[in-house]
C-alpha cells in the first residue's frame, strides 16, 4: 500500500498553494472581501485541486517508468524498482479523480469545469498519442498551463461571476513556463550526458543547454511584461514591487546554475531560505502597496508629456 501512496506524491500538495494568488487577485479586483470567502469552499477547493493533481501524478509515475530508469534519482521510484500492478494503479487514479471532482463540484460549477480541464491536461501531457512532454517546447507550454488553471481555481473560490484579466492569466502561465523551463535546464545539466538525457526524456534529444536557457529567459520576459501590465493598470503603487519581482526571477535563474540545483524540485523550494525571504518581501510590499497611496506615482498614469520649466 505504501508504494501506491508514494506515487500520488502527497508531498507535492504544497504546490497547490498556487491557487492562493487567484484568491488574492479576486479579492483585489471584485467587490468581495475576506469575510465573504467560505472556509468550506476554500477547504474543498484546495483539497479538490490536490486530488486532481495526485491523479495526474499517478499516471505520470506509471507511464514514465520505462524512462525514469535512466535518471540518476528517479530510477529509485517505486514503479521502477517494485512490482506494482496496473489494475491497482488505475483504481488509485480513479479514486483520486472521483474525490477531486466531487470536492470541485462542492465549490461551484466553474471550479468543477476548471478541474476537469486540469485533469485533461494531465492526460495530454502524459498519455499517447499526444504525450506533449515528449515534444520540444510544447512540453513546457502544455505543463505550465496548469499554473494558469490554478489561478482560475483560486479566483472561482471567491467568485463565479467573472474571470481574471488576460494580463494576469498570461503572466501566471508564462511564470509557470519559466519555472518549468528552468527545471528542465537544471535537470539537463545535472544528468550531464546528452545521450542519457535523451533516453530519460525524449524532448531532451532536441534540447540543449543553450536552448533551455534561452527559452527560460523568453518565458521570464513574457511573464514580467504581462504581470507589469496588470500591476500598473490596476494599481500604480504596484510599480514599486516590479524591481523585486525582477530580482526574484534573476535569483531563481542563478539557482538553476547550481550543481544538483533545487530548481529541479519546486516542491522543496520552501527550504531555500534566501528565496523564501525574497518571496516574503514581495508579499509584504504588495500588502503595503495595496493599502497605501503614493501620490508621486500618479503622474506616471498620464499619457501627457512631463513639462520642464526652463
Task: Please annotate each region the language model reported.
Residues 1-15, 78-89, 126-146, 186-217, ...:
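Interhelical loop and helix-boundary elements at the membrane-water interface
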Residues 1-69, 82-95:
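Topogenic membrane-insertion module of multi-pass membrane proteins
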Residues 25-47, 101-113, 151-171, 225-239, ...:
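Helix-coil boundary and interhelical linker segments in multi-pass alpha-helical membrane proteins
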Residues 48-80, 132-142, 178-190, 250-251:
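Acidic (Asp/Glu-rich) catalytic motifs at the cytosolic membrane interface
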Residues 65, 70-116, 151, 165-177, ...:
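Multi-pass membrane catalytic core of lipid/isoprenoid biosynthesis enzymes
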Residues 89-130, 221-257:
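Transmembrane helix-loop-helix
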Residues 157-240:
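Helix-loop elements that line ligand-binding/catalytic pockets
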Residues 253, 258-310:
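Generic C-terminus detector
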Amino acid at each position: 500500500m505504501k508504494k501506491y501512496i508514494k506515487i500520488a506524491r502527497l508531498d507535492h500538495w504544497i504546490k497547490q498553494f498556487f491557487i492562493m494568488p487567484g484568491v488574492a487577485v479576486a479579492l483585489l479586483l471584485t467587490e468581495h472581501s475576506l469575510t465573504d470567502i467560505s472556509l468550506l469552499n476554500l477547504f474543498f477547493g484546495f483539497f479538490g485541486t490536490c486530488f486532481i493533481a495526485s491523479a495526474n501524478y499517478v499516471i505520470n509515475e506509471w507511464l514514465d517508468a520505462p524512462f525514469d530508469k535512466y535518471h540518476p534519482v528517479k530510477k529509485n521510484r517505486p514503479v521502477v524498482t517494485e512490482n506494482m500492478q496496473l489494475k491497482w494503479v488505475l483504481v488509485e487514479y480513479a479514486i483520486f479523480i472521483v474525490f477531486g471532482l466531487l470536492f470541485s463540484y462542492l465549490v461551484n460549477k466553474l471550479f468543477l469545469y476548471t478541474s476537469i480541464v486540469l485533469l485533461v491536461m494531465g492526460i495530454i501531457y502524459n498519455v499517447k498519442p499526444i504525450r506533449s512532454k515528449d515534444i520540444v517546447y510544447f512540453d513546457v507550454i502544455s505543463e505550465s498551463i496548469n499554473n494558469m488553471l490554478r489561478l482560475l481555481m483560486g479566483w472561482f473560490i471567491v467568485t463565479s461571476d467573472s474571470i481574471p484579466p488576460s494580463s494576469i492569466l498570461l503572466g501566471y502561465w508564462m511564470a509557470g513556463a519559466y519555472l518549468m523551463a528552468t527545471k528542465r535546464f537544471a535537470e539537463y545539466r545535472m544528468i550531464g550526458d546528452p545521450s542519457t538525457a535523451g533516453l530519460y526524456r525524449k524532448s531532451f534529444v532536441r534540447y540543449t543547454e543553450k536552448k533551455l536557457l534561452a527559452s527560460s529567459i523568453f518565458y521570464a520576459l513574457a511573464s514580467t511584461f504581462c504581470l507589469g501590465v496588470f500591476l500598473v493598470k490596476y494599481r500604480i503603487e504596484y510599480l514599486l514591487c516590479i524591481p523585486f519581482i525582477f530580482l526574484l526571477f534573476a535569483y531563481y535563474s542563478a539557482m538553476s546554475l547550481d550543481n544538483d540545483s533545487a530548481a529541479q524540485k519546486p516542491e522543496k523550494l520552501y527550504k531555500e531560505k534566501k528565496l523564501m525571504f525574497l518571496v516574503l518581501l514581495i508579499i509584504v510590499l504588495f500588502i503595503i502597496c495595496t493599502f497605501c497611496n503614493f501620490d508621486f506615482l500618479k503622474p506616471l498614469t498620464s499619457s501627457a508629456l512631463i513639462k520642464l520649466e526652463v
